[in-house]
């Protein structure tokens, strides 16, 4: 029986191995044929369906299961270039299927390279918002369901630790810039050295000033030898942006570049000129008139979204209201987008967080309550409706001061909007209702104040001052339309007024003052002010510094330091001898001897003779080769003892630099005109100097970047090594043998006789390594008897000799 079973098993194993080899061979043949089809792909041909492209069977099955069969224009042109491995800049209208244009090449390129979990991260997709990243990830799951790749979603608002545990096993990642950079800096086992493809969805938004530093930091972690795909409805062509992404000869694919309009053809676009204080009235009237439709209302700030949502929710317009802004938690944002997508009739108040890429089904209206910052933002906002050849309508609310500038910006982008007027009989005023609610609810009033400030700030920071002019807006009336008792104070507006007053010319101020004086002369003269009562506190504050001598004393002092003649002063006293010069000495030893000799003489004639003696010159000390110091007082004599104080009397030194040969030169040497002309034309010298300096700074910049990159790499490696050591220590601690608690029955069995090994021989007890083990308790006699019986029973079962010895013992 045994040989026959072995023969059957061996035959079955051989057949299974043979079928496995055939399957692998068939897969390799399909793969090689697929690679050949991609190499022979014609980039100029126009493809209509996914089956016409060289796509693998798993991808084609996923597309068919998700009901994707026909190619759009952007998909037909971009996928063929991406399959060839070229960098692509894709630009197409909103709702034209740009997501599949980069997801299909990702799956195909990784499939052709037989990517597995051991190869690490193969593709990275960066999205500007969390909602768009979730949407891309869901599409990737649908069309990639038959592949074996592992895909992950990395966005803010989720647990960082859970993402770190799974990140090292991912092949495809969909992420937002901030969270991706956090993982690149902090996650130890996350490597990107083997990355094959980088995709930036809504690339113009990702590469603007808001994400510039983050994107630059992410690019620094990625290998330069990769394929890069950029997609957006308004694509960038700036050389600086393309150089930052290390694009190599990119293919610019703009399928609607020659179209008459940059927006979908079935989109009806209108604008309404309504003053700022009447915007909320117009919006409320519009919502009440369209209760059986699905609408998105865009505003410029999250505070406005919250205020309009809370106030309209209290007034109950008769349609479900939702609000979406960046300050909400991720769970709430996801719940709101899901509810709005599934709703048949609803109104969503949102900021620009929902303006790009999000695919809400069957949106009827897009209302822009606030003027967009530029034409690109307008195009992305209205792109939430009229998607996939469906009908849609968009309305833009404009203040009279914004109309001219915004229409000019839209014309430059080939966007045509028609003006419509609001029917007066349909418009309802909600000003009194808002005032009543703000009076009763302080929180709503505070929210309204914040909404007012955030709107004014959003207008103030705009660069396009032709369209956004804060001075032409009626802010007081706008505050009243929000239900506020008055316009809140805004610091930056007050600062502008102060700056204007400060920068006003003196001539204007002089003319103004002159006009005021002339008016006063023409009219009645000003009456003198009545004498006010001056208290002791007023006199105290009017006091001058006590250590400063009065003015009348300064009149007594001549310029040379001598006391002025009393005859020349108006306040001369009759006592002329009250202030008189006693003696005056000059510095020096001779003057001191003269003092001693004059002190011995007491006659008036001797003192007069000394006063008229010829004065000697003061001492002159040579400090340096060029500088000298006159010693004419004792204070000057003390200066000679301090080198630090003498420095201010010395001249400034000259700084010398030494060339390679050791010769000294001044720091700045003037060149002759002839020598300058001998070196060529001035413009040529300037251009040559700029080129040399640019090359030098570029080399230095590259060296600095390489050093910084090396430091970051070393720091990351140290952190990873430290984390590996911690993990290894934790594993060692888990593998350490634990002490087993004492068991009476087991110890009794050991003490009751013997323990028998599998060979039937007694094993010597191993010495215990424990420091201290408690002594076992005394075993009762009935347990000993039970142990002996058990031992006897175990011995009886083993061999025939044991059975005979047991019977002999019982009989005897």
From Swiss-Prot:
One of its GO terms (molecular function) is RNA helicase activity. This is ATP-dependent RNA helicase dbp4. It is found in: Nucleus, Nucleolus. GO terms for cellular component: nucleolus; nucleus; small-subunit processome. ATP binds at residues 92-99. Its main location: nucleus. ATP-dependent RNA helicase required for ribosome biogenesis. Involved in the release of U14 snoRNA in pre-ribosomal complexes. Required for pre-rRNA cleavage at site A2. A motif (Q motif) lies at residues 48-76. Residues 1-28, 503-538, 560-626, 687-797 are annotated as: Disordered. Keywords: ATP-binding, Helicase, Hydrolase, Nucleotide-binding, Nucleus, Ribosome biogenesis, RNA-binding, rRNA processing. Signal peptide: none annotated. It comes from Emericella nidulans (strain FGSC A4 / ATCC 38163 / CBS 112.46 / NRRL 194 / M139). InterPro entries: DEAD/DEAH_box_helicase_dom, Helicase_ATP-bd, Helicase_C-like, P-loop_NTPase, RNA-helicase_DEAD-box_CS, RNA_helicase_DEAD_Q_motif, SPB4-like_CTE. Gene3D superfamilies: P-loop containing nucleotide triphosphate hydrolases. It holds the Pfam family DEAD. It is an enzyme of class 3 (hydrolase). It catalyses: ATP + H2O = ADP + phosphate + H(+). Belongs to the DEAD box helicase family. DDX10/DBP4 subfamily. Interacts with the U3 and U14 snoRNAs. Associates with pre-ribosomal complexes. Residues 8-26, 710-719 have a biased composition (Basic residues). The keyword RNA-binding applies. The lineage of its organism: Eukaryota, Fungi, Dikarya, Ascomycota, Pezizomycotina. Residues 521-538, 579-596, 610-626, 687-709, 720-736, 763-794 have a biased composition (Basic and acidic residues). A motif (DEAD box) lies at residues 201-204. SMART domains: DEXDc, DUF4217, HELICc. The keyword Nucleotide-binding applies.
């Amino acid at each position: 029986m045994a040989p026959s079973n072995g023969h059957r098993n061996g035959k079955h194993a051989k057949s299974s191995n043979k079928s496995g080899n055939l399957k692998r061979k068939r897969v390799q043949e399909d793969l090689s044929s697929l690679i050949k089809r991609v190499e022979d792909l014609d980039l100029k041909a126009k493809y209509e369906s996914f089956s016409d492209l060289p796509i693998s069977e798993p991808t084609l099955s996923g597309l068919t299961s998700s009901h994707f069969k026909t190619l759009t224009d952007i998909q037909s042109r971009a996928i063929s270039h991406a399959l060839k491995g070229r960098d692509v800049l894709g630009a197409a209208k909103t709702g034209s299927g740009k997501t599949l244009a980069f997801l299909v090449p990702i799956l195909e390129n990784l499939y052709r390279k037989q990517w597995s979990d051991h190869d690490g991260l193969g593709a990275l997709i960066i999205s500007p918002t969390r909602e768009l990243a979730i949407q891309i990830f869901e599409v990737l799951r649908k069309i990639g369901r038959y592949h074996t790749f592992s895909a992950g979603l990395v966005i803010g608002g989720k647990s960082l630790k859970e993402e770190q545990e799974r990140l090292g096993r991912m092949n495809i990642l969909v992420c937002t810039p901030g969270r991706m950079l956090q993982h690149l800096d902090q996650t130890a086992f996350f490597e990107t050295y083997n990355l094959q493809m980088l995709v930036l969805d809504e690339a113009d938004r990702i590469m603007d000033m808001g994400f510039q530093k983050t994107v630059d930091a992410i690019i620094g972690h990625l290998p330069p030898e990769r394929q890069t795909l950029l997609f957006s409805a308004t694509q960038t062509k700036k050389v600086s942006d393309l150089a930052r992404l290390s694009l190599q000869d990119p293919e610019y694919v703009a399928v609607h570049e020659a179209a008459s309009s940059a927006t979908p053809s079935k989109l009806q676009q209108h604008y309404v000129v309504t003053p700022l204080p009447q915007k909320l009235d117009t919006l409320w009237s519009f919502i009440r008139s369209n209760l059986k439709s699905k609408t998105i209302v865009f505003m410029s700030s999250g505070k406005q979204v919250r205020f309009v949502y809370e106030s309209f929710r209290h007034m109950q317009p008769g349609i479900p209201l939702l609000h979406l802004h960046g300050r909400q938690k991720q769970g709430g944002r996801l719940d709101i987008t899901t509810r709005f997508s599934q709703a048949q009739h609803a109104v969503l108040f949102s900021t620009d967080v929902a303006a790009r890429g999000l695919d809400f089904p069957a949106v009827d209206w897009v209302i822009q309550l606030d003027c967009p910052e530029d034409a690109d933002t307008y195009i992305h906002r209205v792109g939430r409706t009229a998607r996939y050849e469906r009908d849609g309508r968009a309305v833009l609310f404009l203040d009279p001061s914004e109309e001219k500038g915004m229409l000019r910006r839209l014309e430059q982008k080939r966007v045509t909007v028609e003006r419509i007027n609001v029917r007066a009989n349909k418009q309802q005023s909600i000003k009194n209702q808002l005032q009543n609610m703000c009076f009763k609810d302080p929180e709503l009033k505070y929210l309204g104040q914040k909404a007012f400030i955030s709107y004014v700030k959003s207008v103030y920071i705009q660069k396009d001052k032709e369209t956004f002019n804060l001075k032409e807006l009626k802010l007081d009336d706008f505050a009243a339309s929000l239900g506020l008792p008055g316009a809140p104070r805004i610091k930056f507006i007050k600062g502008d007024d102060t700056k204007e007053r400060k920068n006003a010319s003196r001539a204007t101020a002089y003319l103004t003052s002159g006009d005021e004086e002339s008016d006063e002369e023409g009219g009645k003269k000003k009456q003198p002010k009545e004498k006010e009562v001056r208290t002791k506190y007023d006199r105290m504050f009017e006091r001058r510094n006590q250590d400063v001598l009065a003015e009348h004393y300064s009149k007594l002092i001549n310029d040379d330091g001598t006391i002025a003649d009393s005859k020349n002063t108006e306040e001369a006293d009759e006592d002329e001898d009250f202030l008189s010069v006693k003696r005056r000495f000059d510095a020096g030893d001779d003057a001191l001897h003269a003092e001693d000799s004059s002190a011995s003489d007491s006659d008036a004639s001797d003192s007069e003779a000394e006063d008229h003696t010829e004065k000697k010159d003061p001492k002159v000390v040579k400090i340096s080769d060029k500088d000298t110091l006159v010693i004419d007082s004792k204070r000057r004599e003390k200066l000679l003892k301090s080198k630090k104080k003498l420095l201010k009397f010395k001249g400034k030194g000259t700084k010398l630099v030494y060339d390679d040969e050791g010769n000294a030169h001044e720091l700045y040497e003037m060149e002759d005109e002839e020598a300058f002309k001998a070196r060529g034309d001035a413009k040529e010298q300037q251009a040559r100097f700029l080129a040399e300096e640019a090359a030098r700074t570029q080399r230095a910049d590259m060296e600095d970047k390489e050093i910084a990159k090396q430091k970051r790499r070393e720091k990351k490696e140290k952190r990873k090594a430290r984390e590996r050591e911690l993990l290894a220590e934790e594993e060692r601690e888990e593998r350490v043998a634990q002490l087993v608690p004492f068991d009476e029955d087991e110890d009794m069995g050991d003490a009751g006789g013997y323990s028998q090994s599998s060979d039937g021989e007694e094993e010597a007890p191993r010495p215990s390594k424990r420091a201290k083990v408690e002594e076992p308790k005394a075993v009762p006699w009935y347990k000993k008897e039970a142990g002996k019986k058990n031992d006897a029973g175990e011995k009886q079962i083993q061999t025939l000799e044991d059975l005979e010895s047991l019977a002999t013992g019982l009989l005897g």
